């Protein structure tokens, strides 16, 4: 791929397939959550459905990652999309012939979350190979911009569709998008093969699994970066709970103002992604930029709810822009550093860590929200994450810097 521009046949196709998948996901996730609450009138039952989406991440990824690392990633991607297509067609049929059944949506969430584990690991191991050498930052900038852009457009569209289109037809529409995505993915030439053609045995699986753990024990820089990202992601999700509660209860604030603040963050992400597509940060500067962003981001989170509303908007815009910058630099560096035959295993191990951190931090947010003022809880969680940034990113510069400066040969 060396010497080519970013928009090769394979990169264009995987980007188009990603767009179709994101549109489908955004089109069905909100309506399903709205439907469950409308039918049950229970926040607890709605939350249980959401929790089912996290359960497969706790262990399944670690168990299947060695197999995915040895396999053709394209087959996994196309196969999982085909399986999801069948699930959506089945849901269209079930919802057409029968009334609402809570257990059906619990099963649907568990099945789609399980399939997503396989899909996500195969995608994260395959996608770096589809970016032309030398275009890594631009490639990750584009992929990192897709979700916020589509989310801005699809959130109101999905809410509108929920009121205008029957549930069976929504499932059929998403199935049609998946069928189109499969057709696009099937035309990608690079298949992500790592297999030697040998028979894969339980003994080799255990050996591959152990190799993943050994790599993480040996590579302190990778371990530090992924551990911090588990902290940061969990912190962001948990503080969002307290921020929503603050906007719902504080005088002079409203849910609409919270939505505008989220839009400011998304706009920052879009502008940052566009800038990174045009301007590349040299590898030698990635670590310094990342250190600054992590400290700045957590300080802004700590101060957010103590600011006047206009400053909150500026805060979220800046964090959106800088957050996308650091995420793109991290993805570029880490995927250049990781051996191709270990990507799924390493990502799976840290997905498990991230899922555990998410559950713990959301519990912490719930406890702090009951015991303290909401903005105090946000400041404490963000302060804890700032300490994690110092301990895991800033201080171990000797082992972290080589990861951030990595380039593909």
Please annotate each region the language model reported.
Residues 13-29, 52-68, 72-84, 104-162, ...:
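Substrate-agnostic recognition of the 12-TM MFS/MFS-like secondary transporter fold
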Residues 31, 40-47, 141, 255-262, ...:
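Small-residue hotspots at the loop-to-helix junctions and early N-terminal turns
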Residues 98, 129, 171-200, 394-407:
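Helix-loop junctions on the cytosolic side of multi-pass membrane transporters
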Residues 165-172, 210-270:
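A single, central transmembrane helix in multi-pass transporters
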Residues 33, 88-95, 158, 162, ...:
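Structural signal for membrane-spanning alpha-helices in multi-pass inner-membrane proteins
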Residues 59-62, 70, 74-76, 80, ...:
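C-terminal transmembrane bundle of multi-pass solute transporters/carriers
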């Amino acid at each position: 791929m060396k010497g080519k521009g970013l928009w090769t046949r394979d990169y264009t196709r995987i980007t188009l397939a990603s767009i179709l998948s994101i549109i489908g996901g955004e089109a069905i996730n909100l309506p399903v959550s709205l439907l469950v609450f409308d039918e049950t009138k229970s926040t607890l039952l709605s939350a249980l459905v959401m929790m089912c989406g996290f359960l497969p991440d706790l262990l399944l990824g670690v168990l299947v990652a060695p197999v995915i690392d040895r396999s053709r990633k394209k087959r996994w991607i196309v196969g999982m999309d085909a399986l999801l297509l069948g699930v959506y067609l089945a849901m269209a049929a079930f919802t057409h012939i029968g009334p609402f059944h809570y257990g059906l949506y619990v099963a649907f969430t568990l099945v789609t979350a399980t399939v997503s584990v396989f899909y996500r690991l195969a995608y994260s191991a395959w996608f770096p190979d589809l970016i032309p050498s030398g275009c890594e930052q631009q490639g990750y900038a584009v992929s990192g911009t897709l979700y916020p852009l589509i989310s801005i457009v699809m959130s109101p569209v999905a809410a509108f569709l929920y009121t205008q289109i029957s549930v069976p037809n929504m499932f059929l529409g998403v199935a049609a998008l998946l069928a189109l995505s499969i057709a696009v993915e099937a035309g990608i030439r690079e298949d992500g093969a790592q297999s030697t053609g040998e028979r894969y045995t339980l003994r080799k699986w255990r050996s591959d699994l152990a190799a993943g753990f050994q790599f993480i024990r040996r590579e302190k820089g990778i371990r530090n970066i992924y551990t911090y990202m588990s902290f940061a992601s969990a912190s962001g999700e948990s503080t969002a709970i307290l921020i929503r509660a603050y906007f719902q209860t504080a005088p002079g604030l409203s849910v609409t103002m919270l939505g505008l603040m989220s839009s400011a963050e998304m706009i920052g992400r879009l502008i940052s992604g566009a800038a990174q597509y045009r301007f590349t940060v040299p590898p030698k500067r990635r670590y310094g930029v990342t250190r600054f962003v992590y400290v700045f981001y957590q300080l802004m989170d700590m101060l957010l709810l103590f600011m006047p509303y206009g400053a909150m908007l500026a805060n979220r815009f800046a964090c959106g822009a800088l957050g996308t910058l650091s995420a793109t630099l991290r993805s570029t560096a880490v995927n250049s550093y990781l051996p191709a035959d270990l990507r799924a295993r390493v990502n799976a191990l840290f997905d498990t860590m991230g899922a555990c951190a998410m559950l713990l931090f959301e519990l912490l947010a719930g406890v702090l929200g009951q015991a303290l003022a909401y903005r105090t809880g946000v400041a404490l969680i963000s302060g804890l994450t700032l300490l994690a940034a110092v301990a895991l990113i800033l201080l171990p510069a000797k082992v972290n810097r080589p990861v951030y400066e990595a380039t593909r040969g």
